[in-house]
Curated annotation (Swiss-Prot):
Alphabetical GO biological process terms: heme biosynthetic process
Protein name in the entry: Ferrochelatase
Source organism per UniProt: Picosynechococcus sp. (strain ATCC 27264 / PCC 7002 / PR-6)
Lineage: Bacteria, Bacillati, Cyanobacteriota, Cyanophyceae, Oscillatoriophycideae
Pfam family membership, one: Ferrochelatase
Pathway it works in: Porphyrin-containing compound metabolism; protoheme biosynthesis; protoheme from protoporphyrin-IX: step 1/1
GO cellular component, one term: cytoplasm
């Protein structure tokens, strides 16, 4: 089989407070995150958003220690994965490639090229596929393969998603049971799945399978859990003026409180590592929302991190992928079914959906604000807001 490598893909996160603004810039400069009608608008808008959001985001990171633990956790997952595969007689080297912060995907590929591998397994640490997560990283890699003749000599395979892998489901069930058992009446606690949201148009227009995979994953977990508890699936982390997948986490928590729910356990279903959206958004912001709504006992299931069953599921995914026909970028990022990796460019026109039009109008507003910030003149300065 020769020298085998595994490339773990993840979002990345700022290591310290000074990294927050450039991290946000990298995030919003990704055309898979924000859809714009012309590529030249991407970086100016990313600069504006990252500048406006940096202060609030830094305050959030201060609440969890001043930086994201995502890099350390991902590296620990990589170490545990290599050890598990070694126990099974499969020697691999594991690399970590982050999309928006160090170690960037490009850094990982540079190391891979130096190591002169024979085979590479590309494994995103996103259980469910979305064009804005795994898809974005795949597009970066696809372009590198297209333009680098050395990479073209490397055999590779992609693992697009693994939300239905039995050991992943078992690991989630194990953690959920542990939290449920902390309640006086475990079967009466409401189970609340909170997934990272995406704009509704990604699903309806671009054919993103994310919502379907999230819903199927939730059902598989509840079936394996085998408990009578009521449960809810909602979506968090909405950004911007357009409609995202619903129901929203905050609205759902308030509604459950109004219905008289007192015991609640939250499961971060789309995250496998602790980071800002579990440690700050769920543990602090949503806990406060829940308590104000009358929910008395708020618990959260920890992220999988290096849970033994989770690491074993990753190891099985790797070994299975090495025995199967390779999955290529063309198969994953350019499928025959109705899914388009959004977009590197959108055409202008009035015949698109209202949501896209609203997004474009919002983009124009952002650009107008950018001009006012640069010029120091405009209506916001006139009324004293700026």
């Amino acid at each position: 089989m020769g020298r085998v490598g595994v490339l773990l893909l993840n979002l990345g996160g700022p290591d310290k407070l000074e990294d927050v603004r450039p991290f946000l810039f990298n995030l919003f400069a990704d055309p898979e995150i924000i859809r714009l009608p012309a590529p030249w608008m991407q970086k100016p808008l990313a600069w504006l958003i990252s500048t406006l959001r940096a202060g609030k985001s830094q305050e959030n990171y201060k609440e969890i220690g001043g930086g994201s633990p995502l890099r350390q956790i991902t590296e620990a997952q990589g170490t545990a994965l290599a050890q598990k595969l070694a126990e099974w007689g499969q020697e691999v080297k594991v690399y970590v490639g982050m999309r928006y912060w160090h170690p960037f995907t490009e850094e990982a590929i540079a190391e891979i090229k130096k190591d002169d591998l024979d085979q590479l397994v590309v494994l995103p640490l996103y259980p469910q596929f979305s064009i804005s997560t795994s898809g974005s990283s795949f597009r970066v890699l696809e372009e590198m393969w297209r333009t680098d003749k050395d990479l073209n000599q490397l055999d590779y395979t992609l693992i697009p998603s693994w939300y239905d892998h039995p050991q992943y489901i078992a690991a989630m069930v194990d953690l959920i049971r542990q939290e449920l058992d902390q309640f006086d009446n475990p079967d009466q606690a409401h189970i609340f799945f909170s997934a990272h949201g995406v704009p509704q148009s990604y699903v309806e227009e671009a054919g993103d399978p994310y919502q379907r995979e999230i819903e199927e994953c939730t059902k598989l977990i509840m079936e394996a859990l085998g408990r009578p508890n009521d449960y809810t699936l909602a979506y968090q982390s909405r950004v911007g003026p357009v409609e995202w997948l619903q129901p929203y986490t905050e609205d759902s928590l308030i509604a459950l409180g109004e219905k008289g729910v007192k015991d609640l356990v939250v499961i971060p279903i789309s995250f496998v590592s602790e980071h800002i959206e579990t440690l700050q958004e769920i543990d602090i912001e949503y806990r406060e929302v829940a308590e104000e709504a009358g929910i008395e006992n708020f618990r959260r299931v920890p992220a999988l991190n290096t849970h033994p069953l989770f690491i074993e599921s990753l190891a099985n995914l790797v070994t299975d992928s090495l025995e199967q026909c390779p999955r290529t970028f063309g198969q994953v990022t350019h499928p025959k079914e109705n899914m388009k990796m959004y977009p590197q460019e959108l055409s202008w026109g009035m015949n698109t959906s209202a949501e896209v039009l609203n997004g474009r109008l919002a983009m124009i507003g952002f650009l107008a604000l950018l001009l006012e910030l640069i010029s120091g003149q405009g209506p916001l300065h006139f009324v004293g807001i700026m």
